[in-house]
Each structure stands twice: as C-alpha cells, then as structure tokens.
C-alpha cells in the first residue's frame, strides 16, 4: 500500500502552481493599484491656476526719476563748446514723477509683442553763472536763459520665450525704439535762440525673465541694449529694470522695482560734434492686469 504520508503530500503539490499563480496575480494587482495615479473625473471642478494663460497684459507704472544730463555741442571738431550740466547750469528738474504705460500681446505660448511709451519733458528759466558756448551761440554770465529738453521714446518689442516652465520663463527680445528729442535755449533780451529737433529709430537687443518663488511672489528682470562704434560716432543705449511682484489673484499683480535708462553718445562728426550723457533712473511702482 502506498505510503499514507505521500498520499497527503501529492494534493498539496498539485495545488502549488495554482496557489503561486494566485499569489502573483494578487501582487500584480496590488502594485497596479499602488502605482495608478489618482485622477479627478471630468465633471469635477479643477483648481484655479496661480497665473492665467493670458493673451493681453496692461501695465501702468510710476517712475520716480532722478535725471542726470551732461552735454556739449561744438561749433566744429576743432572748436569745442562748453560742457553743460543741464540740472545745475540750466536749472532743469533733477527729480520727476513719470507715468508710463505698456501693452503686451501674447499671441501664442512662446511669443510676445510689447508696445510702450516713455517720456520726460523738462523746462526751466535761470540766470547763468558761467559763460556757455553752445553750437555757434554764446550765452553770457547773468543772462536769463529759458531752456527746454524733452525726450519721448515709443517702443515696439518682439520676444520669444525659449524657456517656459510653470515656475519660470526666459525670453530673448528684439525691439525698435523711436526717439524724439527736442531742445531749445532762448535769451530773450538779445533775441538769441538755439533749437534742435530730431527723430531716430534705435534697434535694441534684449533678454528678460521671471521666476516664481511662491504662488504669489515673483522676481522679474528685463534689459535691452544697443552699442554703436563707427568712425565718427561711439554710443550706447541701455534700458533695464528689476522688480519684485505680488499677485493678488490670477488676473492682477502689484510690483516694486528699479529702472535705469541711459544714453551715451560721443560724436566727432563735422556737422554734429559733441557728446550727450543722459541717465534717467529711480524706483518703480507698477500694477499689471492680465486678460
């Protein structure tokens, strides 16, 4: 008679493959259940984003500017004029609150088009404390000079966001700034008047970016630059700003920053000999709406 113990073992051996398969299926099912991410049904409300996928941004800002202007206009390259500090010598304002407006279009995920306007208009009347030679005119000590110096910049900028994540973005930009300059100096008792006006397009290359520290706090920076090195003219233009923003909701934010705008031109051209060194810089307060 067969061993009774062997008869007891045989059924267990027969069941072993089935038990092993069942255990493997259970383990696989548990792993599948563990790895599957939880998803919301289509009808469930989605959480609101911190930043909307906007197509239009309107920014209004106030710049507390501290202008610094130095210039010299020569009668000829061999007869230099007098170097003038426009704030000290002519009495132009050395601080001014400047409102500015920017409109940014975002036609796609990586493209931006910005329209901007920047203007600073100043005028003053002062009795001169030194003789000044400006172009081919001489202004004498004690004479009252009424002066005007206005600068308006209209900007059109295209940007491409080559890095774009949920937390940060970096864009390369190319812009055209239309500079409109008006200067005027008048001595009324001698009927002496010297005025210059000019409009010029200025191409600028730039880079800008944003980084989100949290759902509400971000830092952003922007810089545009142009340099010219020709036979008779050397110059550069810099427009840069740095800011920190606080987002009240996905559609509205407030920011505090600093902006500097610099023009530095040195000319040895026979018709326009001289130099201009203009800096407009100061703290910036702005509000931006997204639509």
Residue ranges and their predicted role:
Residues 54-56, 95-99, 150-154, 168, ...:
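Residues that define the transmembrane beta-barrel architecture of outer-membrane proteins
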Residues 59-63, 114-118, 173-177, 222-224, ...:
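Transmembrane beta-strands of outer-membrane beta-barrel proteins
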Residues 177-250, 261-264, 291:
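Outer-membrane beta-barrel transmembrane domain signature
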């Amino acid at each position: 008679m067969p061993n009774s113990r062997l008869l007891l073992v045989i059924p267990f051996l027969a069941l072993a493959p089935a038990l092993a398969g069942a255990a493997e299926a259970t383990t696989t099912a548990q792993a599948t259940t563990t790895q599957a991410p939880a998803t919301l049904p289509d009808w469930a409300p989605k959480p609101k984003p911190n930043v909307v996928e906007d197509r239009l941004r309107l920014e209004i800002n106030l710049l507390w500017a501290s202008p610094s202007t130095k210039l010299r206009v020569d009668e000829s390259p061999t007869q230099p004029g007098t170097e003038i500090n426009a704030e000290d010598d002519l009495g132009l304002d050395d601080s001014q609150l400047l409102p500015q407006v920017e409109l940014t279009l975002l036609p796609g995920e990586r493209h931006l088009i910005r329209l901007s306007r920047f203007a600073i208009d100043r005028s003053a009347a002062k009795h001169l404390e030194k003789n000044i030679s400006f172009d081919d005119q001489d202004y004498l000590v004690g004479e009252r000079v009424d002066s005007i110096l206005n600068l308006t910049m209209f900007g059109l900028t295209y940007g491409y966001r080559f890095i774009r994540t949920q937390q940060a973005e970096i864009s390369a930009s190319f812009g055209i700034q239309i500079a409109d300059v008006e200067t005027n100096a008048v001595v009324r008792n001698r009927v002496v008047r010297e005025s210059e006006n000019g409009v010029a397009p200025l191409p600028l290359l730039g880079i800008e970016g944003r980084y989100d520290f949290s759902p509400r706090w971000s830092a952003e920076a922007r810089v545009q630059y142009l340099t010219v090195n020709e036979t008779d003219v050397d110059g550069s233009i810099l427009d840069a700003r740095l800011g920190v923003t606080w987002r009240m909701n996905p559609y509205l934010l407030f920011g505090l920053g600093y902006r500097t705008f610099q023009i530095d031109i040195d000319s040895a051209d026979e018709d326009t000999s001289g130099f201009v060194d203009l800096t407009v810089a100061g703290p910036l307060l702005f509000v931006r709406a997204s639509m």
